[in-house]
């Protein structure tokens, strides 16, 4: 009788085929929380060389996946269990959607035979993700897996980047297929992948844009995280240097050109946007962050040249001139057009001089405030010390993750970015809770860089348990917590607000004063510091930065420093 192993070809299940498909299509990292029915999928992915970073919560894992997509230009992969795991993962998927970052969420789901019967964690997950997914696929048979994986990966990076979703039922994950057939399916998918078609000629739009910039008396270049995602830093540098036009980065555009660049208008923002007559806006949306491009913040007659990869965005904003295209490509074409007939404002140009003068004045005023050693700490004193410590780091610039109200607002003005994609913050939605996930994504995507998170205590609390994840993977991340005892700080209520049967309860904005956040990481073997003076903070930063090990620096802040809602109190 023949040995059965000699006659039966080797087989694999759906878990292995998902892992194989991801690996063959270039995926190197995954983030997620395992459980029924996807634990084996994570293990199989690791066995094939994919690094799986296991989190405590799908929200943080999803935020990590979205940021990884931005930092690398490749879709970040989130793996979740079914039902509530998928729902928790929506935080990351929606974050990718609103920030236009490539990401794919893969969730297990209940057995197809049990749909509608109240199965374990049953949910119509395709319907649940619809609002935040560019493309949602469900593999109904094991043989569909490679094609489904390929489609969601490709769609995530096509056109305007964003999140996609792949649903894999439990029975499909368990379904068997011969290894030879599986390999054939994966190979066929690899061969059939097509690059996104390049849009037709932009010659007329490029000529019009250059003409507008050439004739402008007070031109301004504005760029955002879309330009950073596009890797447009070299093209932007060339454009600014050949034209002498001042530039203004949005918060996550900082670093594409150094904040210290002579043509930076960051410290003269109000003057720059209020007086410019032509604004070239690249990879940045005219949303609330840029005051919708409307007066009184902007001149009512300003002419916008809007460069965006999304035609829908241009149709929404109705600029004077819209150019649909990738930021790197379009800026390169502008440079080529200008080269044929160069123009440069020059440092002595009145517009350039006025921007430079105002930036210098505002910078000097800020430095006077920063130079003061205020104890108990306000926000400025520790932020200056952190800035100086980050600038002193040798080698590649650290990635700065910023989250909070006052903490993020002050950090945006004080911390200096010199290299592209070295600042991650709450983004388009102003999302709190992204901090630790972003830190982990940055540490994984750029292992040669130190990651420094500057967090408010409220923002830190959303994902604080992920400090264990930092320690478990020994990531070079230092978390600096601005501990002012609550959301915005201490109890700021007026007498008329303190009444009723629960008036003795803490204010809705209050936390336990002087909480020992540094002890949380110590519970897992990381290093914790508590600091209340400039010398203590300098010492903690010097030691933790040099060690490049997981650490939490707990900075005690005056609970009444800062403002409620930071710079957005008018919206509260």
Curated annotation (Swiss-Prot):
Its EC number is 4.1.2.63. Its cofactor is Mg(2+); thiamine diphosphate. The keyword Magnesium applies. The keyword Manganese does not apply. Pfam families: TPP_enzyme_C (PF02775), TPP_enzyme_M (PF00205), TPP_enzyme_N (PF02776). Belongs to the TPP enzyme family. This is 2-hydroxyacyl-CoA lyase. It comes from Arabidopsis thaliana.
């Amino acid at each position: 009788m023949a040995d059965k192993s000699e006659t039966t070809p080797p087989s694999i299940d759906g878990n292995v085929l998902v892992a194989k498909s991801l690996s063959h299509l270039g995926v190197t990292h995954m983030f997620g929380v395992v459980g029924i029915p996807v634990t084996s999928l994570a293990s199989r992915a690791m066995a094939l060389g994919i690094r799986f970073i296991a989190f405590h919560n799908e929200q943080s894992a999803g935020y990590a996946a979205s940021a990884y997509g931005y930092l690398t230009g490749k879709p970040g992969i989130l793996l979740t269990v079914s039902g509530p795991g998928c729902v928790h993962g929506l935080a990351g998927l929606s974050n990718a959607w609103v920030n236009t970052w490539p990401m794919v969420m893969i969730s297990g789901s209940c057995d197809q035979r049990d749909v509608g019967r109240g199965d374990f964690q049953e949910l119509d997950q395709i319907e649940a993700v619809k609002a935040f997914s560019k493309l949602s696929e469900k593999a109904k048979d094991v043989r569909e897996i490679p094609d489904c994986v390929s489609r969601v990966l490709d769609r995530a990076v096509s056109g305007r980047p964003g999140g996609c979703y792949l649903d894999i039922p439990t029975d499909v994950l368990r379904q068997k297929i011969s290894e030879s057939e599986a390999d054939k399916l994966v190979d066929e998918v690899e061969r059939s992948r097509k690059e996104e078609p390049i849009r037709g000629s932009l010659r007329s739009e490029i000529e019009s844009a250059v003409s507008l910039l050439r004739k402008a008396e007070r031109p301004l270049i504005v760029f955002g995280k879309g330009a950073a995602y596009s890797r447009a830093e070299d093209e932007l540098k060339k454009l600014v240097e050949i034209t002498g036009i001042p530039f203004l980065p949005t918060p996550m555009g900082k670093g594409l050109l150094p904040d210290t660049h002579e043509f930076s208008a960051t410290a003269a923002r109000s003057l720059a946007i209020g007086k410019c007559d032509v604004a070239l806006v690249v990879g940045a949306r005219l949303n609330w962050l840029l005051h919708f491009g409307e007066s009184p913040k902007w001149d009512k007659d300003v002419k916008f040249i809007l460069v965006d990869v999304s035609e829908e965005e241009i149709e929404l904003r109705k600029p004077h001139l819209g150019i649909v295209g990738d930021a790197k490509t379009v800026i390169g074409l502008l440079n080529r057009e200008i080269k044929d007939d160069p123009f440069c404002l020059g440092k002595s140009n009145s517009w350039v001089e006025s921007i430079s003068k105002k930036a210098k004045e505002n910078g000097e005023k800020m430095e006077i405030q920063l130079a003061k050693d205020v104890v108990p700490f306000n926000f400025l004193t520790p932020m200056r010390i952190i800035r100086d410590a980050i600038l002193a780091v040798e080698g590649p610039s650290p990635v700065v993750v910023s989250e909070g109200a006052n903490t993020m607002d002050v950090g945006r003005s004080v911390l200096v970015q010199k290299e592209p994609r070295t600042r991650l913050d709450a983004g388009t939605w102003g999302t709190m809770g992204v901090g630790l996930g972003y830190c982990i994504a940055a540490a994984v995507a750029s292992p040669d860089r130190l990651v420094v998170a500057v967090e408010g205590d409220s923002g830190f609390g959303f994902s604080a348990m992920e400090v264990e994840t930092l320690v478990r993977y020994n990531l070079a991340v230092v978390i600096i917590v601005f501990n002012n005892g609550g959301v915005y700080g201490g109890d700021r209520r007026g007498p008329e607000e303190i009444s009723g049967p629960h008036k003795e309860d803490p204010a809705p904005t209050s936390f336990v004063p002087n909480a020992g956040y540094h002890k949380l990481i110590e519970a897992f073997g990381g290093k914790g510091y508590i600091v209340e003076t400039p010398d203590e903070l300098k010492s903690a930063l010097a030691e933790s930065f040099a060690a490049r090990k997981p650490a939490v620096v707990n900075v005690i802040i005056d609970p009444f420093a800062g403002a409620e809602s930071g710079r957005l109190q008018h919206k509260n």
